[in-house]
Amino acid sequence: MGIHPVIGVDVGGSGVKAALVDVERGELVSDRPRLETPQPATPDRVAHTVAQLVDGLGGSSVIGVTVPGVVSTGVVRTAANIDSTWIGMDACGLFSKQLGVPCTVINDADAAGLAEMRFGAGRGRDGVAIMVTLGTGIGSAVFVDGNLVPNTELGHLEFKGQVAEHHAAAAVRKAQHLTWEQWGRRVGHYLTMLTTLFSPELIVVGGGVSRKFDRFADEIAALVPINTEVVPAALQNRAGIVGAALVAAGDR
């Protein structure tokens, strides 16, 4: 291995996960501990949770962290599913101070997309590709010929009279007691809207529900235009951790 493993940390609306990553192969080389996202998810409380996970993994000389919001030059510009006090926060500075090593910060869906385009379902694909992460909310990452268009936040588009993630996120299926088929149709309609906007050749569906893609794939296939391929994420919900580590290693 030409480079030491790098710690990637994926901060979500409900949980924070971390692992050591072999960034040459895109593989986790440690356990993947998880802690509940503190509520309220303020910067200091989240940073403390991240530090607990990093300490448990033995630390690293450089660490990558994702956050669910728009990130520009290390500063959080919007806050989705975390406390509003993140807005305007120098997240790079916060995590670097808390952990005592250099840290990089990237939008969570962008991180997952980078990992899938490098090691997973999008590997070697040109044209327009979209990664959609379905969890507490909906995250997105858009790529053109393999190049990331950062901070798209397509889960915040208006869809059927409300914010899209309030209609079709994975958390909505549980909260509204939807069957997989009912929820799959919602996702299919949402993805169809994205095909109208971007005409992607590929849509990668990520998040924990990617493990159960076959439960709602037929509903998606019945709605999304045939010229757009829709596939589950190969890295499943490991993608955010791997992408965070890639960025920390300077490879994006």
Report the location of each language-model feature:
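ATP-binding/phosphotransfer module of carbohydrate and carboxylate kinases, centering on a glycine-rich
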Residues: 1-62, 71-75, 95-103, 115-130, ...
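Extracytoplasmic strand-loop-helix segments at the start of, or within, the mature domains
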Residues: 138
